[in-house]
């Protein structure tokens, strides 16, 4: 195992950020596919918060944080199956010696959380 990352966020924080900054906030953090998926849900803020937590958890598991080596939109969470899939630049994974990143996300009424394992 290379690293483990975990994150938790209040769903209301994402809602307030969207209400304050609008699409500018969304376009900085989330890919177009993530935005489309989340706004197709009955509670888009819970889905957005889960993806935000996932991005933070992945960055922690890789040990890069969000910044020079890894940008927000370079981490994309997809729902191709029942299990969430995470897409990260292959070149970065190779340079770190990471073969894959596993991801688990969940949310309640107030919080979203994610755990990432880099192997």
Swiss-Prot record:
Keywords from UniProt, A to Z, are:
Cytoplasm, Fatty acid biosynthesis, Fatty acid metabolism, Lipid biosynthesis, Lipid metabolism, Magnesium, Metal-binding, Transferase
Cofactor(s) needed: Mg(2+)
Query: Main location per UniProt?
Result: cytoplasm
Identify the domain of life. Answer: Bacteria
Q: Where in the cell is it found?
A: Cytoplasm
The EC number(s) this enzyme carries? 2.7.8.7
InterPro entries attached to this UniProt entry = 4-PPantetheinyl_Trfase_dom, 4-PPantetheinyl_Trfase_dom_sf, ACPS, Ppantetheine-prot_Trfase_dom
> Is Membrane one of the keywords?
no
Q: Report which residue ranges the record marks as coiled coil.
A: none
* Reaction(s) this enzyme catalyzes, per UniProt: apo-[ACP] + CoA = holo-[ACP] + adenosine 3',5'-bisphosphate + H(+)
Q: Which GO terms describe its cellular component?
A: cytoplasm
Task: Report the protein's function.
Answer: Transfers the 4'-phosphopantetheine moiety from coenzyme A to a Ser of acyl-carrier-protein.
Q: Which family does it belong to?
A: Belongs to the P-Pant transferase superfamily. AcpS family.
Q: How is this protein named in the record?
A: Holo-[acyl-carrier-protein] synthase
Organism equals Chlamydia trachomatis serovar L2 (strain ATCC VR-902B / DSM 19102 / 434/Bu)
């Amino acid at each position: 195992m290379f690293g483990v990352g975990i994150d938790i966020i209040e769903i209301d924080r994402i809602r307030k950020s969207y209400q304050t900054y609008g699409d500018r906030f969304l376009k900085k953090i989330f890919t177009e596919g993530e935005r489309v998926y989340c706004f197709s849900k009955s509670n888009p803020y819970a889905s957005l918060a889960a993806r935000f937590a996932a991005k933070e958890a992945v960055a922690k598991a890789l040990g890069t944080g969000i910044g020079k080596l890894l940008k927000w939109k370079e981490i994309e969470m997809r729902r191709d199956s029942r299990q969430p899939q995470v897409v990260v630049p292959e070149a970065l994974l190779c340079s770190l010696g990471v073969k894959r990143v596993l991801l688990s996300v969940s949310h309640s009424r107030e919080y979203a959380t994610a755990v990432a394992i880099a192997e």
